[in-house]
């Protein structure tokens, strides 16, 4: 064979092999490179969006929702979102049905306030309690109002009068003489049955935008919050991340069964005049406790113990030679109050308030872990009721019976 010809054939073979190698490399490498860039280079900020689109909300608790309208039902039956679509559509349909069912029971409230400085306007929310025209709202919504106008979901309006208010719970009842036929009461639930993580719905009038609905969860339970207009606190408040803004005050916080579980009252803003994900509602069991008296008498009498205190903690326990860390440590006792009359003791020295006070560990046989536990238990009693406190005094257990009084009008906060 000619040497030149052989070299040419060899070079040609090398060229062919090189071309084949390039083609194989191209077809194998390019798809791998694209997949790798998609997985590695995609910005992290995109991931929540992808999860929101592709992940269904957790299923709602089992119950039979109110039948939605035909248009809502048609939307649910035709919606498609892949494998997770039915769950998303079902949840969306449930919420749409709940709004249609519940919104006629929610009202917007506009008030006119006259003062020495002039007149002003305010707005809030409320919900219908019964067919007699009683509406529950916040005291701070209607306090000082000279005129109150209730706006119903169908657009009709009616004037209202204040029947009763309670500063300490920030609750009020107003009444209209006539309601539209479409308006209806909202059922009351049981705030003792709700749990952290339960879904929560708020419907109201934020920033004057009536008929607004927001969704969140129960973030915490058993909060004690200031009433905002009185020196006493509201017990067992519900914390939620459902958006609550100015104008939502007095509106209902509801569960997915369509029951009122609270009355929206406050937000923790951190200085901003808007929702920051921390809202508070007065529990519906406080509503059950207070509102009947507001309707019948125009006011409510809260029980009163007459003590000051704090949670027992490690440092207080150590200072008092106690081997427990839970209880209500009593720092002060009002001498002529119910606790003083019964013989409860606070710290004997103002210079050492964490030494020598009684430590309440039980009330009527129920354990007390914090000072709020004691206050919350008393809050659902009535003046004249008798309670039995188990206390540690100098490390020794004692049982002390106390007859509760009525809250006085104080200048400073006292439990």
Predicted regions and their residues:
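Short, exposed coil/turn segments at beta-strand boundaries within extracellular/luminal domains
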Residues: 394-397
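N-terminal Sec-pathway targeting helices
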Residues: 1-16
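Conserved PDZ fold ligand-binding element
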Residues: 135-136, 341-372
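Hydrophobic alpha-helical transmembrane signal-anchor segments
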Residues: 14-25
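Serine-dependent protease modules
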Residues: 26-326, 331-335, 363, 371-375, ...
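Hydrophobic alpha-helical elements and their junctions with loops/disorder across both membrane
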Residues: 17-19, 144, 324, 346
């Amino acid at each position: 064979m000619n040497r030149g010809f052989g070299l040419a054939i060899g070079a040609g073979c090398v060229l062919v092999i090189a071309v084949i190698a390039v083609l194989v490399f191209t077809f194998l490498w390019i798809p791998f490179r694209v997949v790798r860039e998609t997985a590695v280079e995609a910005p992290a900020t995109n991931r929540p969006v992808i999860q929101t689109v592709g992940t269904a909300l957790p299923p709602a608790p089992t119950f039979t929702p109110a039948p939605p309208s035909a248009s809502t039902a048609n939307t649910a039956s035709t919606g498609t979102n892949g494998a997770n679509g039915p769950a998303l559509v079902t949840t969306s349909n449930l919420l749409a049905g709940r709004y249609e069912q519940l919104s006629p029971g929610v009202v917007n409230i506009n008030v006119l306030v006259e003062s020495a400085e002039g007149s002003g306007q305010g707005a809030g929310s409320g919900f219908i309690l019964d067919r007699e025209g009683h509406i529950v709202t916040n005291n701070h919504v209607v306090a000082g109002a000279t005129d109150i106008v209730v706006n119903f979901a169908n657009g009709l309006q009616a004037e209202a009068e204040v029947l009763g208010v309670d500063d300490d719970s920030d609750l009020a009842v107003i009444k209209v003489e006539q309601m539209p036929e479409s308006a209806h009461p909202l059922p009351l639930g049981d705030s003792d049955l709700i749990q952290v993580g339960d879904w929560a719905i708020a419907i109201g009038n934020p920033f004057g935008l009536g008929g607004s609905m927001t969704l969140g969860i129960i973030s915490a339970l058993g909060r004690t919050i200031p009433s905002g207009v009185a020196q006493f606190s509201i017990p067992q408040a519900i914390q939620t991340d459902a958006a609550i803004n100015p104008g939502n005050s007095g509106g209902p916080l509801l569960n997915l069964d369509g029951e009122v579980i609270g009355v929206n009252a406050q937000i923790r803003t951190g200085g901003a005049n808007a929702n920051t994900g921390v809202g508070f509602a007065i529990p519906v069991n406080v509503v059950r406790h207070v509102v009947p008296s507001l309707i019948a008498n125009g006011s409510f009498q809260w029980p009163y113990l007459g003590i000051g205190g704090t949670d027992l903690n490690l440092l207080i326990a150590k200072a008092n030679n106690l081997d427990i860390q839970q209880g209500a440590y009593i720092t002060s006792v009002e001498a002529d109050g119910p606790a003083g009359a019964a013989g409860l003791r606070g710290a004997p020295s103002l210079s050492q308030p964490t030494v020598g006070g009684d430590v309440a560990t039980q009330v009527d046989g129920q354990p007390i872990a914090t000072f709020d536990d004691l206050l919350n238990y008393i809050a659902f009693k009535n003046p004249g009721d008798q309670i039995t406190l188990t206390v540690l005094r100098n490390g020794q257990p004692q049982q002390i019976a106390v007859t509760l009084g009525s809250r006085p009008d104080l200048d400073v906060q006292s439990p």
